[in-house]
Amino acid sequence: MEAENSEVAALVEKFTGFHAAISKLPSLSPSPQVDALFTELVAACVPSSPVDVTKLGPEAQEMRQDLIRLCSTAEGLLEAHYSDMLTALDSPLDHLGRLPYFDNYINLSKLENDLLAGHMAAPARVAFIGSGPLPFSSLFLATYHLPDTRFDNYDRCSVANGRAMKVGAADVRSRMPFHTAEVADLTSELGAYDVVFLAALVGMTSEEKANTIAHLGKHMADGAVLVARSAHGARAFLYPVVELDDIGRGGFQVLAVHHPAGDEVFNSFIVAQKVKI
């Protein structure tokens, strides 16, 4: 136990250092300095760790919450940068390998599809909430795994949607409409979907995440499936954690939980089914 506590303390100290360094950056837009620092940060999260971020002290929790906010901002700027770069090219899909973490998106979409396939037939309609300016997740699922499925993509930022709708082949884009909306404003629409994906950065705090899941549970159809991206171990310094208790309180039954090992996939995810009350 003492060794574990020492390991956690060392980890908190390391991420406190990252937080301090990132906070001093003049900009979080992609640059050699920003890219190098975030690459180092991501690498520090990959090894297995005993840390449970819910048990951190107030000061460490405050640091972690602000680090998640900084990472969210940087990720949005990174995706916007590469979305603009891709759509300026004649054949954007031929250049996807240029993007950082490209393999992560490929592997994550395959894992999520494989787990879904174990619990349901191919869905007719899917919603992706928090699709962002570079909608790789829905793009890869629509292209490689679910060729007959319609993907409705929701993001609260109209500029992000404007970028996103230019990415992808025309035949896939016809099945991938984009809508500008806050998740809290989606009600009857949610009842039309067989599957709802919840992006990792929709709901930045534990309370926001719990409220979002409760809202989805209130409006999704009975039997529909929620795929909620989360984080585990040291990766929870970069992304919010989805609590299984909040999944249950939202009216869902957990079907599967996946925590990745190694660096092939970064996010954890939870597959849960809306139960009839």
Regions found by a protein language model. Name each.
Residues 133-148:
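Conserved SAM-binding loop of SAM-dependent methyltransferases across substrates and taxa
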Residues 223-233:
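Conserved beta-strand signature within the Rossmann-like core of class I S-adenosyl-L-methionine
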Residues 150-155:
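Conserved SAM-binding motif I beta-strand of class I
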Residues 39-121:
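Conserved Class I S-adenosyl-L-methionine-dependent methyltransferase catalytic core
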